[in-house]
Amino acid sequence: MAKGVRLIITLECTECRSNPAKRSAGVSRYTTTKNRRNTTARLELNKFCPHCNKHTVHKEIK
């Protein structure tokens, strides 16, 4: 059976991993889909992080 074109990916906050002095413990993660033919590189989006209490860059993780 062939693989589908759309993948479910996870986006993780980059500042939560590196900053121990934040508002609350934990790491912000979002799930979304991407088209593997149109977007072959790792996805980076600016999303709100409730742990940092601000908008930060969220990068795609495996």
From Swiss-Prot:
SUPFAM superfamilies linked to this entry: Zn-binding ribosomal proteins
One cellular component (GO) term of this entry: ribonucleoprotein complex
Keyword Glycoprotein attached: no
InterPro entries the UniProt entry points to: Ribosomal_bL33 (IPR001705), Ribosomal_bL33_CS (IPR018264), Ribosomal_bL33_sf (IPR038584), Ribosomal_zn-bd (IPR011332)
One Gene Ontology molecular-function label: structural constituent of ribosome
Keywords from the named record: Ribonucleoprotein, Ribosomal protein
BP GO annotations: translation
Keyword Ribosomal protein: yes
Family: Belongs to the bacterial ribosomal protein bL33 family.
Record's protein name: Large ribosomal subunit protein bL33
